[in-house]
């Protein structure tokens, strides 16, 4: 096995600083995007309900025309 390489404390500090800053940025970005995604999912669900209701009504009207007494 290869022995570990000595790394400058300045480089270590830079790496860990970048890691921590990246984690902080990711957490902030996630907290910003999460409510938007929830709102989009809610709107999509409402739209799906509306479209399903329209399809149901359309299907009932088509069935009513087929069962008409004026055949």
Swiss-Prot record:
The keyword rRNA processing does not apply. It is found in: Mitochondrion; Mitochondrion inner membrane. GO terms for biological process: proton motive force-driven mitochondrial ATP synthesis. Its main location: mitochondrion. Keywords: Acetylation, ATP synthesis, CF(0), Hydrogen ion transport, Ion transport, Membrane, Mitochondrion, Mitochondrion inner membrane, Phosphoprotein, Transport. GO terms for cellular component: mitochondrial inner membrane; proton-transporting ATP synthase complex. It holds the Pfam family ATP-synt_E. One of its GO terms (molecular function) is proton-transporting ATP synthase activity, rotational mechanism. PANTHER family: ATP SYNTHASE E CHAIN, MITOCHONDRIAL, ATP SYNTHASE SUBUNIT E, MITOCHONDRIAL. Component of the ATP synthase complex composed at least of ATP5F1A/subunit alpha, ATP5F1B/subunit beta, ATP5MC1/subunit c (homooctomer), MT-ATP6/subunit a, MT-ATP8/subunit 8, ATP5ME/subunit e, ATP5MF/subunit f, ATP5MG/subunit g, ATP5MK/subunit k, ATP5MJ/subunit j, ATP5F1C/subunit gamma, ATP5F1D/subunit delta, ATP5F1E/subunit epsilon, ATP5PF/subunit F6, ATP5PB/subunit b, ATP5PD/subunit d, ATP5PO/subunit OSCP. Subunit e, of the mitochondrial membrane ATP synthase complex (F(1)F(0) ATP synthase or Complex V) that produces ATP from ADP in the presence of a proton gradient across the membrane which is generated by electron transport complexes of the respiratory chain. ATP synthase complex consist of a soluble F(1) head domain - the catalytic core - and a membrane F(1) domain - the membrane proton channel. These two domains are linked by a central stalk rotating inside the F(1) region and a stationary peripheral stalk. Belongs to the ATPase e subunit family. This is ATP synthase F(0) complex subunit e, mitochondrial. It comes from Rattus norvegicus (Rat).
